[in-house]
Design a protein with these regions (language model features):
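A short, solvent-exposed loop/turn motif at the edges and junctions
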Residues: 28, 42, 50-87
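N-terminal active-site segment of His-dependent metallophosphoesterases
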Residues: 83-85, 90-161
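Envelope-exposed proteins and targeting segments
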Residues: 22, 29, 97-99
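Structural motif
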Residues: 3-20, 106
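Beta-strand signatures of extracellular beta-sandwich domains
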Residues: 3, 25-27
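A short, amphipathic beta-strand motif
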Residues: 1-6, 39, 101
Length: 161
């Protein structure tokens, strides 16, 4: 349970004067629910869940210091199994009382440009550098692009990359 709300002051906390946003979809990866008139939603949360908001038009999710959108909450009270080859998720502890999603108002465009990469799969740091320096760096200067996205197999077999 939680709220999707207009975080007017962009402090990532639902203050008393900030109102919920109705009609926003939230999912647990299995089910999708819609927020009510107050921005409230209810959805089942297992002990291995990722709860996420589906960004509506004219709204933006917060971004972190790496410019990555913050639109989800991982709930794994015990974390990932210790016998995994790669680290996985640290224990998150008990489920919070509310899982709230702040959104910021923005003027959405009907038409926009985006850049999509499919399956870059570098297998070494040298290949990561090649991809960054010879491909991504060329696209940074492209005008009018709203966002970029990498899909599919992002790295080869070494997830530490």
């Amino acid at each position: 349970m939680g709220y999707v709300y207009n975080d007017v002051n962009e402090n990532l906390s639902m203050d008393k004067n900030e109102i919920g946003i109705s009609g926003v979809y939230v999912s647990n990866g299995v089910e999708i629910v819609k927020t009510d008139k107050d921005g409230k939603y209810k959805i089942p949360v297992s002990d291995d869940a990722i709860i996420f908001v589906i960004k509506p038009r004219n709204w933006m999710t917060p971004i972190n210091n790496l410019n990555l959108p913050q639109f989800y909450y991982i709930h794994k009270p015990n974390g990932s199994p210790s016998n995994f080859t790669f680290k996985g998720v640290d224990p998150t502890g008990p489920l919070p009382r509310n899982i709230n999603f702040p959104l910021y108002a923005e003027n959405g465009k009907s038409n926009f440009k985006m850049i999509v990469f499919g399956d870059p799969q570098p297998y070494s740091l040298e290949e990561v550098d090649f991809f960054s320096e010879n491909i991504v760096s060329e696209l940074v200067a492209v005008k009018g692009v709203e966002f970029g996205m990498t899909m599919g197999d992002i790295v080869g077999d070494n997830l530490d990359l």
